[in-house]
Each structure stands twice: as structure tokens, then as C-alpha cells.
């Protein structure tokens, strides 16, 4: 599979970072995965969805409930952080499609395994896995 060009990945990440967020807190985070071993581990965490390992790059989006909760309390923790991370991922998706890249929204995964694989803080909540690349024709 062809690799996603660095300038295209940069555009995808810039689009994601331009997404609005509650109170402009940006209570979201992203991990960029290119390592094949890590992608294979994510396949296992995502219930065997093999295409994740085949993608050139995999973006994993997280909500940061505590960051939002410090300003907005329980509503920030349970709603705003989730909305922020989802919009963040959606902007990345839209930019990838605009660049004629193939991507698939993966929402079926074991949260704890994803956090363990990517060594994230315990309060980060995985929201979506977005494998990006060029589809086989």
C-alpha cells in the first residue's frame, strides 16, 4: 500500500486541530500511529478489524473528560469532551476525504486495551480509530 504523503497527513492534522471545542478548551487529544506492530495490536483491541494494520497511518482520537470537567463540571465530563473529540475526528475525516484518501471510522474497540497499547493517561477516553491510506483498486 502506498504511504500517505507527509504533507497530506499534515493537512489532515491541521484540519482536525481547527475544530471548535467547548470554551476553546480543546479537551481532546490524538495519537498518530505508523508502526506496524502498534497497528497490529490495535487490530486486536478493535475486535480483529484487520484493515487497521493495512492502513498507511492510523489516527486515534481521545476525549479528555477531566479537562472539560474542570470548567464545566459533570456536563463537561460526560458531554462536551465527547463532542469535542468527535468533532475533532470528523474534521480529520473530512479533510482526508477531500484529499482523496480512504478512511474508515472505527468505533468498536476495547477502550482499556487501546489506552494500554498507546500508553495514554488513564483519564483519556478513546473515541474513534481512523485508519487512513489509499484503497486498493
Describe each region flagged by the PLM.
Residues 29, 109, 128:
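Residue-level "edge-of-site" marker
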Residues 16, 59, 76-117:
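Small-aliphatic-rich amphipathic alpha-helix that forms the alpha element of a beta-alpha
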Residues 50-55, 119-137:
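A glycine-rich helix N-cap at a beta->alpha junction
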Residues 1-10, 129-137:
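Specificity-determining recognition surfaces
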Residues 8, 13-14, 18-88:
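Glycine/small-residue-rich phosphate/adenosyl-binding loop
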Residues 26, 102-105, 125-126:
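A short coil-to-beta-strand element that immediately follows conserved catalytic motifs
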Residues 37, 116-119:
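Short secondary-structure transition/capping segments
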